[in-house]
Amino acid sequence: MDSVSFFNPYLEANRLKKKSRSSYIRILPRGIMHDGAAGLIKDVCDSEPRMFYRDRQYLLSKEMTWPSLDIARSKDYDHMRMKFHIYDAVETLMFTDSIENLPFQYRHFVIPSGTVIRMFGRTEDGEKICVNVFGQEQYFYCECVDGRSLKATINNLMLTGEVKMSCSFVIEPADKLSLYGYNANTVVNLFKVSFGNFYVSQRIGKILQNEGFVVYEIDVDVLTRFFVDNGFLSFGWYNVKKYIPQDMGKGSNLEVEINCHVSDLVSLEDVNWPLYGCWSFDIECLGQNGNFPDAENLGDIVIQISVISFDTEGDRDERHLFTLGTCEKIDGVHIYEFASEFELLLGFFIFLRIESPEFITGYNINNFDLKYLCIRMDKIYHYDIGCFSKLKNGKIGISVPHEQYRKGFLQAQTKVFTSGVLYLDMYPVYSSKITAQNYKLDTIAKICLQQEKEQLSYKEIPKKFISGPSGRAVVGKYCLQDSVLVVRLFKQINYHFEVAEVARLAHVTARCVVFEGQQKKIFPCILTEAKRRNMILPSMVSSHNRQGIGYKGATVLEPKTGYYAVPTVVFDFQSLYPSIMMAHNLCYSTLVLDERQIAGLSESDILTVKLGDETHRFVKPCIRESVLGSLLKDWLAKRREVKAEMQNCSDPMMKLLLDKKQLALKTTCNSVYGVTGAAHGLLPCVAIAASVTCLGREMLCSTVDYVNSKMQSEQFFCEEFGLTSSDFTGDLEVEVIYGDTDSIFMSVRNMVNQSLRRIAPMIAKHITDRLFKSPIKLEFEKILCPLILICKKRYIGRQDDSLLIFKGVDLVRKTSCDFVKGVVKDIVDLLFFDEEVQTAAVEFSHMTQTQLREQGVPVGIHKILRRLCEAREELFQNRADVRHLMLSSVLSKEMAAYKQPNLAHLSVIRRLAQRKEEIPNVGDRIMYVLIAPSIGNKQTHNYELAEDPNYVIEHKIPIHAEKYFDQIIKAVTNAISPIFPKTDIKKEKLLLYLLPMKVYLDETFSAIAEVM
């Protein structure tokens, strides 16, 4: 008889007779009742949800006291002043029917409805606080001949129910300039329309725009207004001069909640942080049918959740495990036991409300863990979990923007939202910041932490879990280790500091930094500078700026491909596009849209940029200084100040904060150009984007012309850079061999290397002074010798005698297998570090087809051929390590979304599913090996040969040696193609022709031979 290993009060109905007010679906593995039993128990239960902790039973409720936590009561504060730090803010609405407990001073702001900004943070004493801010108006601007008719139109929109909400609003004349297009005069017939309710403002603004009104700034949200209009920080310290505590009828779940008017707040510049609480969590699921769990399937339940509670600084490390069924003790871990999945999830969310962390991290939690929990509570249990956020009527949810569904995983991401909580998923963070063959947690931990996960296979988890308390402890440890690793990754990369600095700089919330694109971060900055100049931003509708003329992108000069055994100097333009925009005053505010506006100006006051049949004109700084240019200058100046401050900073934490700040400034500067070129953005302007790239092309071409015409004699270098005849080893040859967007490659023959290295920065300064306007600056970056220039965007060069620089070659592509990379690297190393091979390569590249036939290849080339023969032997004799033969592709979307199903990585996933093995997630890099085809099937496609590497190793399946060797030949040819002589023979065929012939017999032939 099976032993009962878990007391379930619902199956022992007579033991507990108290009923809850509502019933719920109860789902639990049969194995937690009877060790080893398969399947699930599903029924409806009307008993109160509960949990067990250290052999004691606790009823689950929102207001319960959590047994393992010691929650201190808040202290009394001086009502006249308080200092606090905020990390998040949300906009909310309040209505007349909810003002019973609201102090009288603030009621008129929300009658009949109104905006309340809720700011979340910590007091200077470290207590969690919610600050309710009243009096922030939301507004837009509208052109209308008569203000009274505009008021009547808005009243009508409210009364007819199109807006479905009413609030107070005010219309007043406004005297503003438009940011878009140079205009010395203010906008005529302009009115500012202000609302007490941000939602109503946005809806009416959109309706007016659709009805043909010219409107401005309807896309500016109320939080941006709050930060920009008041000069407030979105992440930082505040003083509140006076406030009233919200003691009764709180809107938040925090101990300290206060009300104040927007004018009572004072933003402070202190960059230090208080101590914020963080969670790292991970979930384990049980797929009912052995497949990868789907949150919407009733039987695919969550069986465990691990939580590591820690702080942004310090060593606090508190470990919690939520589990179905009883579980053996795990040292240092608080274990909470539950009888059903609903109770486990409810307990987790109650714990979230009570401990109330400010930051939550994990690995792929946005796309899986949190999403899974939200879907289970919503779709399966129909339970609103918003009350477990920082607000009692808050929100916990996920969304994938509709327009992003088709983009694939790497471009789109699930947006997660919890009122007062910031999610910092380490999966997208590390995916964007490091290069790895795949981005599984185990791989990233090995690379970044030099740690490996203790493995528990996908198939073992269900067996262990239902085996008994000890098995559940094994699964629990496995679940906990993921959370522990993420904490270490979180503290290593310090992404939260970077997010905070971008938020402060861009006047946006930290949540916006994490989940929105660069446009949403640049837009408030432009709004801020425009406001300073009494300018307003037009709200764009579909127009010529959105449809746009096509404009030519960045220039890449046709490379003079070849193997260069002489030094090649590489120059870079510093911050090219921002520099062009500053140097030439390119901006919305300087763009000439109406020639009548410049009738009184001379041509010397105007920059004209010609692009084929199109011409764009901009006024120069003497007429109006560019808004974008001012922003860029300020940011770059701040970055220089921050970097200088870093040099003198001895405090490690302060130095880290300063580094994140300078990085935020750099990223923001580089994003401005992209905002103007985004066709469907908030402020698109093809004229600016096209002019920037056009001027960039002109700069590149003028540099090439100057070098190839002026810098060709020894006399020039002696006069300009102080060289003497001893600095030259023969007739000087200087030539630009390649130009790529913001880089220039200049080959220099017959100059002493040390002399060239000494004057290279001087050459960059000389060209800058002769050709460009400030702040455009050409800088010396490096010298490459030798250099293999393969084609556009692809080259290999040696820097500083030992460092190899690769760009665009198979050696660094994620899709190439390690074996191919290893062979290519060995051959490249021969070309760059073996003088005999270098000499032979130069000779080989100049040989004719006749010379090849008569003389054969130079001796040094035989070293390359020998390495290829060794690789061929390893492959055809099955001596190559399968782990080094793994190819990979990213599962960028759900399998059903692929139009082409016959892809190698999809074939592997289907094989895994057939064998009921663990299925990868969207976004994972799928590893596979090409196996040998059946006899006679030489033309088999890759998708038919692709197999999971572990399966190949386990079953000792032979690999497809011919395909792998073919990959090697192609990769080597691509990497070293410039050393091949110019013949009629294709380079791949020539390389194969140079290799000695050898026949390899397969196992079938060998067996026949043995019999005979």
Curated annotation (Swiss-Prot):
Q: Where in the cell is it found?
A: Host nucleus
One Gene Ontology term of the biological-process aspect is: DNA-templated DNA replication
According to the UniProt record, which cysteines are disulfide-bonded? none
Q: Which domain of life is it from?
A: Viruses
What PROSITE patterns does the record point to?
A: DNA_POLYMERASE_B (PS00116)
A GO CC term attached to the entry? host cell nucleus
Q: Which top EC class applies here?
A: transferase
Write out the transmembrane intervals: none
Under Pfam families, the record lists: DNA_pol_B, DNA_pol_B_exo1
Name the reaction it catalyses. Answer: DNA(n) + a 2'-deoxyribonucleoside 5'-triphosphate = DNA(n+1) + diphosphate
MF terms from GO for this chain are: DNA binding; DNA-directed DNA polymerase activity; nucleotide binding
Sorted UniProt keywords: DNA replication, DNA-binding, DNA-directed DNA polymerase, Host nucleus, Nucleotidyltransferase, Transferase, Viral DNA replication
What are its E.C. numbers?
2.7.7.7
Broad class of where this protein is predominantly found:
host cell
PANTHER family, from UniProt?
DNA POLYMERASE CATALYTIC SUBUNIT, DNA POLYMERASE DELTA CATALYTIC SUBUNIT
Record family assignment: Belongs to the DNA polymerase type-B family.
Q: What is this protein called?
A: DNA polymerase catalytic subunit
Q: Which organism is it from?
A: Human herpesvirus 6A (strain Uganda-1102)
